[in-house]
Amino acid sequence: MDLQKFTQQVQQTIADAQNLAIASEHQEIDVAHVFKVLLTESDFAKRVYDVAEVDTDALQKVIENTLEKIPVVSGSGVNYGQAMSQALFQLMRDAEKEQQQLEDDFVSTEHLILAVMDQKSNPITAELKNQHKAKKQIKEAILKIRGGKRVTSQNAEENYEALTKYGRDLVAEVRSGKLDPVIGRDAEIRNVIRILSRKTKNNPVLIGEPGVGKTAIVEGLAQRIVRKDVPEGLKDKTIISLDIGSLIAGAKYRGEFEERLKAVLQEVKQSDGQILLFIDEIHTIVGAGKTDGAMDAGNMLKPMLARGELHCIGATTLDEYRQYIEKDAALERRFQKVLVPEPTVEDTVSILRGLKERFEIHHGVNIHDNALVAAASLSNRYITDRFLPDKAIDLVDEACATIRVEIDSMPSELDEVTRKVMQLEIEEAALKEEKDPASERRLEILQRELADYKEEANQMKSKWESEKNEISKIREVREQIDHLRHELEEAENNYDLNKAAELRHGRIPAVEKELLELEAENREKTAQEDRILQEEVTENEIAEIVGRWTGIPVTKLVEGEREKLLKLADVLHQKVIGQDDAVQLVSDAVLRARAGIKDPKRPIGSFIFLGPTGVGKTELAKALAFNMFDSEDHMIRIDMSEYMEKHSVSRLVGAPPGYIGYEEGGQLTEAVRRNPYSIVLLDEIEKAHPDVFNILLQVLDDGRITDSQGRLIDFKNTVIIMTSNIGSNLLLERTEEGEISPELESDVMQILQSEFKPEFLNRVDDIILFKPLTLADIKGIVEKLVEELQIRLADQEITITISDDAKAFIAEEAYDPVYGARPLKRYIVRHVETPLAREIVSGKIMPHSSVEIDLADKEFTFKVTE
């Protein structure tokens, strides 16, 4: 017996049967071992018996019983599974005869299945005959699956029913109601139909950005074929979506991938144009399966595409089409391009309205129309790195999923009460052990409290269950309507007019009426009482999801946030002392943005802060970041002194192609792409190279910039703050009593205009002059720094108080108008914090003690009280 005459699957089956015999401690490999392996591991054997309508469960039981009857030989030196039984040897010889009769080149699985029908006194043969299965029926099933093919290679079983194995029948999926409806895209579908109707080169390729609906167009064509809304030439055709991944997966041996693809193409060719092959991500066929000396999938398709034997529809993105298909000119010319543009917001709303019912049925929720409009408009405005309608559909889907999860989870109010009951029950069990009067009194009170909580929990639970049941009932009725509509469509397509009339005028209206009654009843209950569960998806839910994805707050203002925004200026005044104009302008810009009346095409605000060092320019940016985001992490700080050379400018938007760091992206663009809602602080802009400002022109004017990767980065939700020391000497010399005169402002502006180009300055919203700090301002800053020190010491449970004399002395000693507030910090560190630290380390100041800091003869004194 020559094993080379067997297909690889048969060889593997014999090897697995041998392993089974060894594991079972059987001396010989029997027919039962082989068929046990075939029925568990061979898809082909299972498929043959399915087509022949064999009860495989009963067959497997017979095989198990046969294996149990084989005697187990134990002991040392016994060779298990080293020989074939006489019955198996006979089966192999009969299989070779079957191979010769069918004129095949190799013995394959089907020959074993046929050969077992001729075995005498074999339990498997007896069981098949008991099921009234003759060899003729099994042979017919095999020939049906083979589809006229012969076994010409050792991978023959892999190539039977290749389209079923490696593809999905989209038309069958439409008929079974698995695909979502396709709304719009009529022009593109008509274009595809026109190309498919050509004599040669009838292969459209859909090209568009990811998420614009390329695959949906093919699904729309499948739906039209089912509705017979296509020209005569396309009626009754089938669209098979080819899965390149499963075609390549598991092709271990050289030439196996080509054989599989050849089998697919052969089946398409034999269909005489009845099968349209749809290859999603068609760029994957270029180079697919290419190994040393092998031909890739693209080259195998070319001859059939050119002759018009293969109707192929491709879909790929613009970038991948350019990268893969355009490079292969011979392949490109065999396809006709169909460009799929991104739909408008209005078209997206229509698409969402078409999908609304499907989402409602799947999630069991009720979607408001304003939620669909919000999903289209908010995704278009805030999610700029993805495309409509995909991003809008994802928003609606996630909002529905959020509501569904809340419906299925235990409500937080009920959860709290249930936990309280559990806590009281534990306490009750502990108190029952105690016998003293106080414990008994406490137990009595606790039991009354527990009874109240249990009653409340039971009421809430029953209310939750009833609300959940109502929602489930509505969902079931919606599913029923969807099922009936699908039946109606099927009846109309099959011209079953009696059934169609019964559905259209009888069953569907009755179920729709039931749904309306249930929804009305639900609304009535909602109006009358507070409901635990919410099943409505409104624009607020959509806005929440947008906020979660992007970090941009787009929800309607809640009361707490209104207060926070209205008091923003006051809070900033406390953090940044002495710069009232700057604080007011910045807080007004944030207020306009959050109220939704800012220009949607520009950043929230762009400012240049001018002033001497240490007056609060950077501090204001930090305070704003902390107030808007509760942390300074959302502040993107870029020190412009790092961008003094011409070549360093490209670091902002990313290195150009061919340079190191190209893949990493720019320092500014990547930071904003990750956090689109943030404060961008460009510190010391006068130190940057002039070319930096050319990059900033588009950011300030249109709120957008393209990075080195070609991605559009959105700056429309950023506050851009630039700081500079230009004109600080004039501000220091000529500021009188903390006020800046109009003449001084004009002189500073002239210096600024000589430093920066007019087109840059013209795009900035406001140029704010920071005044040098007065002694009164410095006293206010001392208060702030002392408060910060008190917060730091609170961790060690030490409280400090500083007398007014000491504070005034610190302000006078550390005040220097040239350096602003920074010397103040240094003075406090040197004269207050360092002596304090020495006292703490030496053990003179212990935790839980108070320290009074006073002034005596221009020296600080520390009085410690426990």
UniProtKB/Swiss-Prot annotation:
Region (Linker): 343-551
Chain intervals for the UniProt region annotation (NBD1): 161-342
Ranges for region Repeat 1: 6-70
Chain residue ranges for the region called NBD2: 561-772
Pfam families: AAA, AAA_2, AAA_lid_9, Clp_N, ClpB_D2-small
Induction remarks: Induced by low temperature.
GO terms under cellular component: cytoplasm
Residues annotated for ATP 2 binding in this entry: G611, P612, T613, G614, V615, G616, K617, T618
Domain of life: Bacteria
Chain residue ranges for the region called C-terminal: 773-866
SMART domains: AAA, ClpB_D2-small
Residue ranges of domain Clp R in the record: 3-148
Main location: cytoplasm
SUPFAM superfamilies: Double Clp-N motif, P-loop containing nucleoside triphosphate hydrolases
Record-stated family: Belongs to the ClpA/ClpB family.
Domain remark from Swiss-Prot or TrEMBL: The Clp repeat (R) domain probably functions as a substrate-discriminating domain, recruiting aggregated proteins to the ClpB hexamer and/or stabilizing bound proteins. The NBD2 domain is responsible for oligomerization, whereas the NBD1 domain stabilizes the hexamer probably in an ATP-dependent manner. The movement of the coiled-coil domain is essential for ClpB ability to rescue proteins from an aggregated state, probably by pulling apart large aggregated proteins, which are bound between the coiled-coils motifs of adjacent ClpB subunits in the functional hexamer.
Protein name in UniProt: Chaperone protein ClpB
Lineage, highest ranks first: Bacteria, Bacillati, Bacillota, Bacilli, Bacillales
Encoding gene (name): clpB
